[in-house]
Amino acid sequence: HLLGRRQRQMCIRDRFKMGRKTPLAMEPRSYVCDINKRTNELTLYSSTQVPGIIKDAILTYLGINGNQITVIAPDVGGGFGGKASLYMEELIVVAIANKLQTPVKWVSDRYEDLLTTSQGFEEIIEAELLLDEKGNFISLNSNVYGDIGAYSIYPWTAALEPMQVAGFLQGPYKIKNFCSNVKCITSNKPPTGPYRGVGRPAAVFVIESLVDMAARKINMNPSQLRLNNIIRKNEQPYNCLLYT
């Protein structure tokens, strides 16, 4: 947290709490696995956003040959990220259909969908922005604590949301010194996964709030402070960070 502190002229810091959000698609998660008894080929119809990932998981966990299973995502309504992960019901309907040699259908009701669909956005973010007397950004330091729920989610892992928050905290600004510590904390809640921007809304809210606070601190127009620190077109591609 001392990164860039020797150059510090002033420090703007705050603590931000982001509330948990739940995707709620009009169509609940639904799966049908059909079987061709003559060829022993399975076809899974899933309201998923990631049919390729679902097929890979079926091959991995059920030991089914790649030419034996086809995953089809028909035209469905919005998923908003909540249908972009593997759910155990997808594996279960395929396993039962393969075992019993009969079609299997599973449709979640609204209550089940609300309780078991992956969620997002529950973080506490401690951040401080250091800038000089002219308003030039010197460094950004942060701690990101993410409530990731009871278990990880395939294939993104439970760290997806908190890591994305940390990765986007700098926004479009020239900040040469950046440090972020991320801690993922388990709880008795549903797992977190991709949903509506995956870390970007929280990151943007934090950095832009700090910039507004800094503008008030140095009595500068917030738009001018942003223009003074924004990455210019002639500075692209811009990458000054060392990732560890």
Where are the model-predicted features located?
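Single conserved hydrophobic/aromatic residue that forms the stacking wall/gate
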Residues: 1-8, 12, 243
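Glycine-rich and small/hydrophobic secondary-structure elements
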Residues: 25, 82-133, 192-217, 238-242
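Gly/Pro-rich active-site capping loops and adjacent beta-alpha segments
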Residues: 50-54, 59, 112-201
